[in-house]
Curated annotation (Swiss-Prot):
Its cofactor is FAD. The gene is ACADM. Residues 1-25 form a transit peptide. It comes from Pan troglodytes. GO terms for biological process: fatty acid beta-oxidation using acyl-CoA dehydrogenase; medium-chain fatty acid catabolic process. This is Medium-chain specific acyl-CoA dehydrogenase, mitochondrial. Medium-chain specific acyl-CoA dehydrogenase is one of the acyl-CoA dehydrogenases that catalyze the first step of mitochondrial fatty acid beta-oxidation, an aerobic process breaking down fatty acids into acetyl-CoA and allowing the production of energy from fats. It catalyses: a medium-chain 2,3-saturated fatty acyl-CoA + oxidized [electron-transfer flavoprotein] + H(+) = a medium-chain (2E)-enoyl-CoA + reduced [electron-transfer flavoprotein]; pentanoyl-CoA + oxidized [electron-transfer flavoprotein] + H(+) = (2E)-pentenoyl-CoA + reduced [electron-transfer flavoprotein]; hexanoyl-CoA + oxidized [electron-transfer flavoprotein] + H(+) = (2E)-hexenoyl-CoA + reduced [electron-transfer flavoprotein]; octanoyl-CoA + oxidized [electron-transfer flavoprotein] + H(+) = (2E)-octenoyl-CoA + reduced [electron-transfer flavoprotein]. PANTHER family: MEDIUM-CHAIN SPECIFIC ACYL-COA DEHYDROGENASE, MITOCHONDRIAL, MEDIUM-CHAIN SPECIFIC ACYL-COA DEHYDROGENASE, MITOCHONDRIAL-RELATED.
Length: 421
């Protein structure tokens, strides 16, 4: 399996050397003036998108309902995605990865989410867990923890949220006490995606005991091996949607972490943890768009087949207008994540656009899933049709990686600051 993945990486890396993506721009690359913005993907981008699309439609969709019913973690699908090069796409080339940009990851994420957002979330959970190391890890940390993920289909997790600290990240209570060359960690985390499947965690803990210490100095980011003594993994949570994703609580009791596993240094953790979101929120938004597109497709197909009052549903203006509104919304949501991804790949701070994309796409996914259920009527409310699952799966897009309300706070702050400055 590792040999197959290695061949896949070599092929895709060779593609990237020949200008694989017009949308993805390295931060240090100078763009030629006057070229403007292109809506056209390169042929290679289309091929990668087609690979993800084929995988979603032929391998994910046929088994998605069963995984939703059982809640079983989709190991065969994750292994297959890894073999196809559809996982861990952010890992740098010098660590054995593809070194793709956020725009590229978004194209893949949308297609995977079209098949099942539970599967997509498990895969995207890896990207979120890896991102702090990608943006802040030293060479040794990157090679040790990212490199191994290109050798076999391992998982990782972003271990930040706590029972009493979700949106309020600065309110976390998990403590890290420095003793010699080690840190002793005690605390409880909650709602950790891939929590029971991860090989290692990115963990954020309070290292400054002063309760008045500012957030940008009070927390430290750690890489923690999942098999470290003192880690207690809780039961898998039975959630409303995305049920095949592994979500758990984790307790850390006198867990020893060596100093070499600290990212950057003491007090740098909050900035590292928040910095990851500029790269991962566009990808989450892309997943929401994938679900929204699926809802639109299912509703349209049904409306073209179902007759009422002697007419096809699409021949009723009320339904055709609903479909038109759905189509408009999904196209705009897609543009929002593409702009956010393009900005960060161009080396610019994209917090404003990332939050717009995350909030807008999350809301649109919920609206379109609801509309799809409405168009299917009683059938939409039944498990024999896929749209009820879409409606359950959609809700979390307004919650994880920053609620829709938090995104609006960020957008408002960024918008107002532009006028103040």
């Amino acid at each position: 399996m590792a040999a197959g993945f290695g061949r896949c990486c070599r092929v895709l890396r060779s593609i990237s050397r020949f200008q694989w993506r017009s949308q993805h721009t390295k931060a240090n690359r100078q763009r030629e003036p006057g070229l403007g913005f292109s809506f056209e993907f390169t042929e290679q981008q289309k091929e990668f998108q087609a690979t993800a699309r084929k995988f979603a439609r032929e391998e994910i969709i046929p088994v998605a309902a069963e995984y939703d019913k059982t809640g079983e973690y989709p190991v065969p699908l994750i292994r297959r995605a890894w073999e196809l090069g559809l996982m861990n796409t952010h890992i740098p080339e010098n660590c054995g990865g593809l070194g793709l940009g956020t725009f590229d990851a978004c194209l893949i994420s949308e297609e995977l989410a079209y098949g099942c957002t539970g599967v997509q979330t498990a895969i995207e959970g890896n990207s979120l867990g890896q991102m702090p190391i990608i943006i802040a890890g030293n060479d040794q940390q990157k090679k040790k923890y990212l490199g191994r993920m290109t050798e076999e289909p391992l998982m990782c997790a972003y271990c930040v949220t706590e029972p009493g600290a979700g949106s309020d990240v600065a309110g976390i209570k998990t403590k890290a006490e420095k003793k010699g060359d080690e840190y002793i960690i005690n605390g409880q985390k909650m709602w950790i995606t891939n929590g029971g499947k991860a090989n290692w965690y990115f963990l954020l803990a309070r290292s400054d005991p002063d309760p008045k210490a500012p957030a940008n100095k009070a927390f430290t980011g750690f890489i923690v091996e999942a098999d470290t003594p003192g880690i207690q993994i809780g039961r898998k949570e039975l959630n409303m949607g995305q049920r095949c994703s592994d979500t758990r609580g984790i307790v850390f009791e006198d867990v020893k972490v060596p100093r070499e596993n600290v990212l950057i240094g003491d007090g740098a953790g909050f900035k590292v943890a928040m910095g990851a979101f500029d790269k991962t929120r566009p990808v989450v938004a892309a997943g929401a768009v994938g679900l929204a597109q699926r809802a639109l497709d299912e509703a349209t197909k049904y409306a073209l087949e179902r007759k009422t009052f002697g007419k096809l549903l699409v021949e009723h203006q009320a339904i055709s207008f609903m479909l038109a509104e759905m189509a408009m919304k999904v196209e705009l949501a897609r543009m929002s994540y593409q702009r956010a991804a393009w900005e960060v790949d161009s080396g610019r701070r994209n917090t404003y656009y990332a939050s717009i994309a995350k909030a807008f796409a999350g809301d649109i996914a919920n609206q379109l899933a609801t509309d799809a259920v409405q168009i299917l009527g009683g059938n939409g409310f039944n498990t024999e049709y896929p749209v009820e699952k879409l409606m359950r799966d959609a809700k979390i897009y307004q919650i994880y990686e920053g609620t829709s309300q938090i995104q609006r706070l960020i957008v408002a702050r960024e918008h107002i600051d532009k006028y103040k400055n």
